[in-house]
Swiss-Prot record:
Keyword Disulfide bond annotated: yes
Protein name, as recorded: Sensory neuron membrane protein 1
Function text: Plays an olfactory role that is not restricted to pheromone sensitivity.
UniProt keywords, alphabetically: Cell membrane, Disulfide bond, Glycoprotein, Membrane, Olfaction, Receptor, Sensory transduction, Transmembrane, Transmembrane helix
Highest taxon above the source species: Eukaryota
Tissue: Principal component of the olfactory cilia membrane. Detected in both male and female antennae but not present in leg, abdomen, thorax or head.
Ranges facing Extracellular side: 33-458
MF GO annotations: scavenger receptor activity
């Protein structure tokens, strides 16, 4: 028995609506997910791989120095007063070199190189980099603090070494041009014949701490970032490609061939998270991201804060901080023991970089209130000093990022050194940096064209199929049962119903149908 034409149309329309529903909510998401898994992996053919190897645009790198306005008083034990000078703006170009793949275990080995270009026109008003900054002598204080930690009985010898190398300084501060301490370098005179300074310089040359360049005539050149600029980092990083499992993309599995560090205690020695330049797709606000920082020898675990948007693209904002090592069980393994953790918001980097430095959020944001009491001139503000990253959740692409960190040092107080005996002994700020990313219009358009435009087109087509299919079913059903509907309507019109008046009089009222005489009222 063949179906009537209207029912055929209804069946076809129903199929169209069903196909639209299935394609829009089942088939297309599966296709998109499958395609994203291929595109987000670090295989040679993907655009993500090309951008991962060499970011095709510069990152914002801003440095803020703290100028000490009462250095002479601090030398006598006064609370330091600081004034922030900055930003000194640099373009930061990132590239990975000596890239080697291992398809068998789905990994890539690489080294990295960073290039910094100073842009005075984008720096703070009037800043040229030639400004003289008064700040603690980092090299001098590092020498004293290292001896204090490693061999405190040798502080007297360290005092003689400092006097010999720095020509009997009157205080622990240096007066230095901004670009000199940042990149160009300041000269450390190791051309000494006295025992203490000569022994100290020999040790320095042997251990070759970060930031040191060896010059002729026993001279050393020290800067904060000069050694890193346009130089290949010697460490070999191994990460997952994500071809076999896209959720592993960029995950650090080894550095210099070692699958764990030998720096901290227990689980803190594990490499957890990506290398910070790529993240897995399909993020939800419940996901806890992880990235590993080789500079700080630790992983960070940003958490979801709120939903945001960037250039019309919906994003999720994640935030992070340094943490409270004493009260967070996950972080206590960064301390020698739970009762020897630094104050909230501080991390001791000595074991990581072999230099007595502490890191915190800028202006001690979210740190122990005592840190702010020990320095005047700081004004922590979450908007200006917090760590935040806005991710496009489907692809896991960072759209906007502000990674901020402050470096601090202790003004060591010690009776064994005349230069240190009156210092306040507190931890004070040196400088803070902001590494920023804002995906430019070119790559925003690329993301939209590859991800969101197809999604919207498919969504519109599917809704049209569902709408027209549903309307087609309704119309076909109505058309098919049109005769029955009309018959019922006619039958209803030809019927007479009696209505009983409100009073009990013997009256009848008829309702007039077709070809019927008017009813009489009795």
């Amino acid at each position: 028995m063949q179906l009537a034409k209207p029912l055929k149309y209804a069946a076809i329309s129903g199929i169209v609506a069903f196909v639209g529903l299935m394609f829009g909510w089942v088939i297309f998401p599966a296709i998109l997910k499958s395609q994203l898994k291929k595109e987000m992996a670090l295989s040679k053919k993907t655009d993500v791989r090309k951008m991962w190897e060499k970011i095709p645009f510069a990152l914002d790198f801003k440095i803020y120095l703290f100028n000490y306005t009462n250095a002479e008083d601090v030398q006598k034990g006064a609370v330091p007063i600081v004034k922030e000078v900055g930003p000194f703006y640099f373009e930061e170009w990132k590239e990975k070199v000596e890239v080697e793949e291992n398809e068998g275990n789905d990994t890539i080995n690489y080294k990295k190189i960073d290039v910094f270009l100073f842009k005075p026109e984008l720096s703070g008003p009037g800043l040229t980099g030639e400004e003289v900054i008064v700040m603690p002598n980092i090299f001098m204080m590092a020498m004293a603090l290292t001896v204090y930690r490693e061999k405190p009985a040798m502080l007297n010898v360290a005092a003689k070494a400092i006097n010999g190398i720095f020509d009997s300084p009157s205080d622990v501060f240096m007066r230095v041009k901004a670009l000199d301490i940042l990149f160009r370098g300041i000269i450390i005179n190791c051309d000494r014949t006295e025992f203490a300074p000569k022994a100290a310089c020999t040790t320095i040359k042997k251990e070759a701490p970060n930031g040191i360049v060896f010059e002729p005539n026993n001279q050393l050149r020290f800067s904060l970032f000069g050694v890193r600029n346009n130089s290949v980092d010697p460490h070999v990083v191994t990460v997952k490609r994500g071809v076999q499992n896209v959720m592993d993309v960029g995950r650090v599995v080894a550095i210099d061939g070692k699958t764990k560090m030998n720096v901290w205690r227990d689980s803190c020695n594990e490499y957890q998270g990506t290398d910070g330049t790529v993240f897995p797709p399909f993020l939800t606000h419940k996901d806890r991201l992880q990235s590993f920082s080789g500079d700080l020898c630790r992983s960070f675990k940003p958490w979801f804060q709120k939903k945001t948007s960037y250039n019309g693209i919906k994003t999720n904002r994640y935030v992070a901080n340094i943490g409270d090592f004493a009260n967070d069980p996950e972080l206590q393994c960064y301390c020698d023991s739970p009762d020897k953790c630094p104050p909230k918001g501080l991390m001791d980097l000595y074991k990581c970089i072999k230099a007595p430095m502490f890191v915190s959020m800028p202006h001690y944001l979210e740190g122990d209130p005592e840190l702010l009491k020990n320095v005047k001139g700081l004004n922590p503000n979450a908007k200006e000093h917090g760590i935040e990253i806005d991710f496009e959740p489907i692809s896991g692409t960072p759209m906007v990022a502000k990674q901020r960190i402050q470096f601090n040092i202790q003004l060591l107080k010690s009776e064994k050194m005349d230069l240190l005996k009156d210092l306040p002994g507190t931890i004070v700020p040196l400088f803070w940096i902001e590494e920023g990313l804002s995906l430019n219009k070119t790559f925003v358009k690329m993301l939209k064209s590859q991800l969101f435009i197809p999604k919207r087109v498919v969504s519109v087509v599917c809704w049209c199929m569902i709408s027209f299919g549903s309307l087609g079913v309704i119309a076909a059903v109505i058309f098919h049962f049109k005769g029955d509907i009309m018959h019922l309507a006619v039958a209803g019109d030809n019927s007479v119903s009696k209505i009983k008046p409100e009073n009990d009089e013997n009256k009848e009222v008829g309702v007039m149908g077709q070809n019927q005489e008017p009813a009489k009222v009795m």
